[in-house]
């Protein structure tokens, strides 16, 4: 938890101390030319790029994935979305590795499943739900 707070504080400090303008770099495009994968950056004094955010888009232009980058790696809360714009999943990365509680949702907003990651591995009790919100089952990922 301390690492998450530290990563968020570093990101806030970076943006508050920077006079640079956030710029967009389209890394990949869909076949129709629309943006697919975009990274946002500020330029360092030496002209190099310091990436601070990663966003992916569906072919139709709606956001699919979004989250912060620190030191070239995913750091902080990343979210994925359905084409409708509804939240699909939410989880934290530290130095590019999944860490902490993660949620996946049905398009209606109800939790589909939730669990914990430690050093990129599923651990503990994961809960799976029906689309109506009723608990379906619990699986102990430590016993696999």
Where are these regions (language model features)?
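Periodic aromatic/glycine/histidine/acidic cluster detector
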Residues: 17-81, 86-94, 98-105, 110-118, ...
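Sec-dependent N-terminal signal peptides
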Residues: 4-14
